[in-house]
Design a protein with these regions (language model features):
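Auxiliary Fe-S-binding modules of radical SAM enzymes
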Residues: 1-9, 20-22, 68, 75, ...
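Mobile, glycine- and charge-enriched loop segments
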Residues: 27, 31, 41, 47-55, ...
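Active-site beta-loop-alpha junctions enriched in small/polar residues
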Residues: 34-36, 87-89, 131-135, 155-157, ...
């Protein structure tokens, strides 16, 4: 009880320090719609205007159509949460409720809550957060498959407030023991749960502390309490407590600060901003890290007299305390896992979330032809002179708002210092020689996507003479490079890759052959039963000039085991490139991000890339590849996010520039993934290279990307100049393209239609054993 005697300023200072320790500069809110499914209630709380008896001409429950109409408006406005708030068990008090439930085919209000929540989840993608009142363990289990989270305010631990004359007299569901039983039931059913206390209804400070300690004990026992709300009583006309005194702001601040001290730095602590009116920014001074649900489309039906502050005002108030505002989901990031989220809800949660488990802050996804949500703003760069370790890199990936602007500015400044204002690109042709593959990559729509128009198409295999024809055509159009990759056909051996290189070099000796990922190299060597060094040397002698850095995905095996378990491991990928560098073959390194991984995995990928470059020194560039989700199998199964947000995409390019300096100095952007507007923004975030003109591109298109298959030199240079930069046509190894090649690349003739004969015409025979390097470790 030492807390009772401490000065408010001292408590608030400690609470703020704890908040900053646990949550840094981040303050969240949940963009929501409020769905008052029924305003009938068997309880008669003396301060409540939400619940009322039946009214003539009014239905007891919203119809499903009405529920969906509200939810759809919210979804269109960018909401992520559908908050279901309702009276407690009205059917136990009112015949009209029982009759209406019977007509709806439901026995209880909870039955109807489940039906309405399921409709919202399935029809709109909004994530239901249910406040259905007191529940048993069986009730919680029934609600779990249709909700992302649930909640019930404990309100108070004091039984005396339920006695005659108290605000909860006549309200059986407000008995503290019953509400604590609901909190425990939710914990037993692994439900992410929100609870809290209501202050100013007659309880003492000591009773508030006792209530908070009761919440803490249940949180420690079950781990399910995701958020604690400290809500202040507001007197409302027409209630029995209309004349009651409201708690002063200092009392609310004291309670918030004490809650933070008792619950600790990692707890999520909320106070509703609308109930403090113009004083709401001061709530931050007491240690909250969340503003709760804020709706752009519906009122607060529980407190209709208190409108939510506009989002811009909320942001300004947050930033005035040196904090950053970010939208979240109704379920907090720490609870987004199979332990806490039902498999029927998880797909919607993943699709609504970003890499931190917060709400996607923009509607952008890689490959979509839509306007970019923002452009980098001028800002004072952060200091990045010291080499960044894994912890520092992971921390930078959490940057948002002004802090993100500073990261992007630092990357842009370093790019200017290292690369100047030139932006390079290479005239190349992509050739994917088959879309048949026996590996099981969950992200790949190229070999496993739907047979949709303009996407994967039918299985095919390109014969050598067609590969050679495309190379000759590319040479005539000014290309200096051909990039070859494809699926791993079960009949391929190392001899296949050798034969392709020899055929190309015999026909077009001046063309740089940039071909075969680490997976193809590993598989080729294994099928011939020769060491990697011998096989890579033979490829080099046949005419292979460099390796693409694809198949890297994320260089962290905890992610690879999920997305590509039979592919090369992290160590195997690094080994292939280490050996390639030793035999004189340069390569690049890629990173595919925005699916199941997060900032920690990105940081490990960058550190491992940097260490490999420090060791072998022959990576030419780093290429971030945002995950294109639309046709990816693991996204269609509900097992992946919808690609990175635009903010995350710019951060990956920028932090790659900062973290890889001075070892890898070229950072490339994929125009296929970002489109022209995205490329222009990336050029202000550390990027100095636009990659290849491609001529043909199938892999991103198979996944659903809408951007074109060729970015001609004329258009490439126009885009670069429009960004205030200087275009430079380069070779694969970053020399200047010969003038003869450059001249040939402008005004090139249209491409002939490529020939992709059906795979049945390939007449390849599979070997008796398939190489699966990921399963061999």
């Amino acid at each position: 009880m030492e807390l009772l005697a401490r000065p408010l300023d001292e408590l608030c200072a400690e609470a703020r320090a704890l908040r900053d320790e646990g949550h840094g500069h981040l303050v969240t809110y949940s963009p929501k719609v409020f769905i008052p499914l029924t305003k009938l209630c068997r309880d008669v709380c003396h301060y409540c205007t939400f619940a009322h008896p039946p009214r003539r001409g009014e239905r007891a429950y919203m119809s499903i159509d009405e529920v969906l109409a509200v939810a759809r408006v919210g979804a269109a406005a960018g909401c992520r949460e559908a908050l279901f708030t309702l009276g407690d068990k009205p059917e136990l008090r009112y015949r009209v409720a029982r009759d209406e439930l019977e007509a709806l085919g439901c026995e209880t209000t909870l039955d109807y809550v489940a039906r309405a929540a399921e409709a919202v989840l399935g029809e709109t993608g909004l994530l239901p957060h249910l406040n259905p009142g007191v529940m048993t363990r069986e009730d919680a289990a029934r609600m779990r498959p249709v909700s992302a989270s649930m909640g019930l305010m404990l309100e108070t631990i004091s039984d005396r407030l339920s006695a005659r004359g108290g605000p909860h007299f006549g309200s059986p569901d407000k008995v503290p023991a019953r509400r604590l039983e609901t909190l425990a039931a939710a914990g037993e059913e692994r439900v992410p749960f929100t609870t809290g206390i209501l202050i100013g209804i007659g309880e003492s400070r000591a009773e508030r502390i006792e209530a908070l300690l009761g919440i803490r004990e249940l949180a420690e026992r079950y781990g399910h309490v995701q958020e604690v709300i400290v809500q202040n009583f507001r007197a409302k006309p027409g209630t029995r407590m209309a004349a009651a005194s409201e708690p002063p702001l200092e009392e609310l601040l004291w309670t918030i600060a004490v809650a933070r001290i008792l619950l600790g730095p990692r707890a999520h602590l909320q106070a509703p901003p609308n109930l403090s009116y113009d004083d709401f920014p001061r709530l931050l001074d007491a240690g909250i890290d969340d503003w709760g649900g804020v709706s752009p489309v519906t009122i607060d039906h529980v407190n209709p007299e208190a409108p939510w502050p506009e989002l811009d005002r909320l942001r300004r108030a947050t930033e005035s305390r040196g904090l950053e505002l970010a939208p979240r989901l109704p379920v907090y990031p720490e609870w987004i896992s199979g332990e806490w989220i039902d498999p029927r809800v998880m797909p919607a949660v993943l699709r609504a979330s970003d890499s931190l488990g917060l709400a996607r802050e923009d509607g952008w996804s890689p490959g979509e032809d839509v306007s970019i949500p923002f452009v980098p703003r001028d800002a004072l760069p952060i200091d990045t002179r010291a080499e960044l370790g894994e912890e520092e890199i992971a921390r930078l990936f959490r940057a948002r708002g002004h802090e993100r602007d500073r990261v992007l500015a630092a990357a842009d400044s370093l790019r200017r210092e290292v690369c100047g204002d030139e932006v390079s690109y290479v005239v190349t042709r992509n050739i994917q020689y088959t879309n048949v593959c026996y590996f099981r990559c969950g992200f790949c729509a190229f070999s496993k996507g739907k047979l949709a128009a303009n996407l994967r198409g039918a299985p095919y295999f390109v014969p050598h003479d067609e590969i050679v024809r495309r190379c000759q055509e590319a040479w005539e159009r000014g290309a200096t490079e051909v990039c070859l990759q494809g699926g791993i056909h079960p009949a391929f051996t190392g001899d296949y890759y050798l034969s392709v290189v020899r055929a190309i070099k015999e026909a077009v000796p001046g063309l740089h052959v940039h071909a075969f990922s680490a997976l193809e190299i590993w598989q080729g060597a294994a099928t011939l039963e020769v060491p990697l060094e011998d096989y890579l040397t033979e490829l080099r002698d046949a005419g292979l000039s460099s390796l693409p850095g694809t198949a890297a995905e994320i260089l962290d095996d905890e992610v690879r085991q999920v997305i590509c378990p039979d592919k090369v491991t992290t160590a195997q990928w690094l080994q292939v490139h280490d050996v390639a560098h030793r035999v004189g073959l340069r390569s690049n390194v890629t990173m595919m991000f925005g699916h199941v991984e997060g900032p920690r995995n990105w940081a490990r990928h960058l550190v491992r890339s940097r260490e490999q470059q420090r060791s072998s020194g022959d990576f030419t560039e780093f290429v971030p590849l945002p995950f294109v989700h639309m046709e990816a199998p693991m996204w269609l199964r509900g097992q992946a996010r919808s690609g990175p947000t635009f903010g995350e995409t710019l951060l990956v390019h920028a932090i790659a520039r900062l973290a890889l300096h001075p070892w890898i100095t070229n950072i490339q952007v994929s125009w296929v993934k970002l489109g022209a507007q995205g490329v222009a923004a990336a050029l202000r975030a550390g990027v100095n290279d636009l990659g290849g003109t491609l001529m043909n591109e199938s892999i991103s298109r198979s996944a659903g990307a809408e951007h074109g298959q060729e970015f001609a030199p004329e258009a490439m240079e126009e885009l670069i100049r429009s960004a205030g930069r200087i275009p430079r046509q380069r070779t694969t190894l970053y020399g200047d393209a010969p003038e003869e090649r450059r001249l040939a690349s402008f005004g090139a003739a249209p491409l002939a239609e490529p020939w992709n004969p059906p795979v049945k015409d390939a007449r390849l025979v599979a070997p008796p054993r398939l190489v699966r390097p990921g399963f061999a470790t």
